[in-house]
Curated annotation (Swiss-Prot):
Family, per entry: Belongs to the universal ribosomal protein uS9 family.
A single GO molecular function term of this UniProt record: RNA binding
Protein name per UniProt: Small ribosomal subunit protein uS9
Gene this chain is encoded by: rpsI
Annotated segments matching region Disordered: 98-130
GO cellular component: cytoplasm; small ribosomal subunit
Biased composition annotated in UniProt, kind: Basic residues: 111-130
HAMAP family in UniProt: Ribosomal_uS9_B (MF_00532_B)
NCBIfam families for this protein: PRK00132.1
Organism listed in the record: Sorangium cellulosum (strain So ce56)
GO process terms (BP): translation
Amino acid sequence: MTETRTYATGKRKTAVARVFLSPGTGNIKVNQRPADDYFVRETSRMVMRQSLELLELLDQFDVSATVVGGGHSAQAEAMRHGIARALCELDPERRPSLKRAGFLTRDARKKERKKYGQPGARKRFQYSKR
């Protein structure tokens, strides 16, 4: 018995999602918990499901993911990225539509570090001319 289970990694900010995709009924688990329990905000749930909804495959795959780091929003986007990559690995013909929607693009924006001699990354201390 060979189970067709596909693995992919999705990232966003400091969140990393290890996503396992297998044929099923649309059951989504995040860190061994149902996705609806893990993601409290409806927008996070919507973001996470976007790549499956785009291809109308929401009820054809079971998703199991382990997510670490970042906040809930970044974790949801990391899952979306991972699910999209796993779907491409299963069927390369899905790639153009996922790429067009921007789900395969790694969002490289991260928090800019604080610099010494100033209170934040960009903010400067008040300057007095006189």
